[in-house]
A protein has these predicted regions:
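Loop-rich non-cytosolic ectodomains and luminal regions
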Residues: 1-300
Length: 300
C-alpha cells in the first residue's frame, strides 16, 4: 500500500490493509481459469464480510473471449459481488486497443451490391489460434471463407453444431453456439489448427452474405494479443469494443490508460463503444496515467 518508505514515496491508499489472493495453480504455459477468478473473488468478499470491513478489489485480469456486452456469466458474477456490503471492484480495460484483434461490420451490401468482406492477416510461423464471430441469433446469412491460396469454403446458418474441414495445410474446426439465458447473441467459433507445423500464412477472407437480417451487426474477435503472433490481425480492425472481459461488467469501475506526455488516450488501452454522452454504462469509467510510470523494483 506504499507506507514503508519514510514518507519519500507513498501509495494512493497508504493506510489500507492488503488481502492478496493468488489465482490458479503452478501449471506451465497456462493462465488462470474463469472459475478460479470467481473463487478468488468469493474468498475476498466473504473475508471482508466476516471482518466487517470495506473492500476494494483491484483486478488486472481479462481476455477477449465473449460478446463484450456485460451479459456473460463472469460479468454478471462481478455485478453481484459489487452489491455485497461495502464493495468496489476496479478492473483494467486491457491492452487490446491497438492489437488489431477486433473487426466489426453489418450484413448490408455496399452500393455496388458487394457482400461485406473481413480480411485477416495470418503471420509467419503462426501456431493454432481462434476467431470468434458474434451476431444476433435472429440474423441468418451465408459465410464464404477463402484461404490464402484461394480455396473456398461455403457455410450457412444451418451449420451443424460442430464441423471439421481442411483448407490447404490448415485444419478448421467450426462450432455454432446457441443463445444463453444471459444473452440472445450467437457465437460462431473458428478454430484454426496447423495440419503440419503452422497455419497457412497470408490473408484469410470472411465474406458474409445476408439472407434474413433483423439486427444487422456482427463482431469478430481474435484471442488476446499475447496469443497470436504480432503479424496476425484484422486489416480493417477497429479499437471500439476492445475492452477485455470482465471490464465490460456494468457495476465495476473500468479504468483505461492515458499518456501524460502527449495528453492523449493511450493507443493500446481498451476502448468501449462509441456512444452519446447521455447513454448508460459508458466504458471506461475514467482513465489514469498508464505510460512510462515510475515504480519500485526489487532491491530498490
Amino acid at each position: 500500500s506504499g507506507n514503508f518508505m519514510d514518507g519519500r514515496f507513498q501509495g494512493v491508499a497508504p493506510e489500507a490493509e492488503l488481502l492478496i489472493v493468488k489465482l490458479g495453480n503452478s501449471r506451465p504455459n497456462s493462465f488462470p481459469k474463469t472459475t478460479e477468478l470467481m473463487r478468488g473473488l468469493t474468498f475476498a468478499a466473504r473475508t471482508a464480510l466476516q471482518l466487517s470491513m470495506p473492500l476494494v478489489i483491484n483486478l488486472s485480469f481479462g481476455n477477449t473471449y465473449g460478446v463484450h456486452d456485460g451479459t456473460s456469466l463472469v460479468e454478471r458474477f462481478l455485478d453481484n459481488i459489487a452489491e455485497l456490503g461495502r464493495c468496489v471492484i476496479c478492473v483494467g480495460s486491457g491492452n487490446e486497443g491497438a492489437a488489431g484483434g477486433h473487426a466489426a461490420g453489418t450484413f448490408n451490401r455496399d452500393a455496388q451490391g458487394n457482400i461485406p468482406r473481413t480480411e485477416l492477416a495470418v503471420g509467419e510461423y503462426q501456431a493454432s489460434f481462434s476467431v470468434q464471430l458474434w451476431k444476433e441469433y435472429t440474423d441468418t446469412f451465408r459465410i464464404v471463407l477463402q484461404s490464402p491460396g484461394g480455396q473456398i469454403l461455403q457455410l450457412n446458418s444451418a451449420l451443424d453444431t460442430a464441423v471439421r474441414y481442411r483448407m490447404e495445410d490448415t485444419e478448421l474446426l467450426i462450432y455454432q453456439g446457441e443463445p444463453t439465458p444471459y444473452s440472445v447473441r450467437q457465437e460462431i467459433y473458428f478454430d484454426f489448427l496447423p495440419a503440419n507445423s503452422y497455419v497457412n500464412q497470408g490473408v484469410w477472407s470472411f465474406m458474409i452474405e445476408p439472407v434474413q437480417v433483423e439486427g444487422g451487426g456482427y463482431d469478430f474477435y481474435l484471442p488476446s494479443s499475447s496469443v497470436p503472433s504480432v503479424e496476425t490481425r484484422f486489416f480493417q480492425s477497429t479499437p471500439e469494443k476492445t475492452l477485455t472481459i470482465p471490464s465490460t461488467a456494468a457495476r465495476v469501475i473500468t479504468v483505461g490508460a492515458y499518456d501524460t506526455y502527449t495528453e492523449a488516450y493511450a493507443d493500446f488501452s481498451g476502448r468501449g463503444r462509441n456512444m452519446p454522452p447521455s447513454s448508460v454504462n459508458i466504458k471506461p469509467d475514467f482513465v489514469a496515467p498508464g505510460v512510462n510510470i515510475k515504480t519500485l523494483s526489487p532491491g530498490n
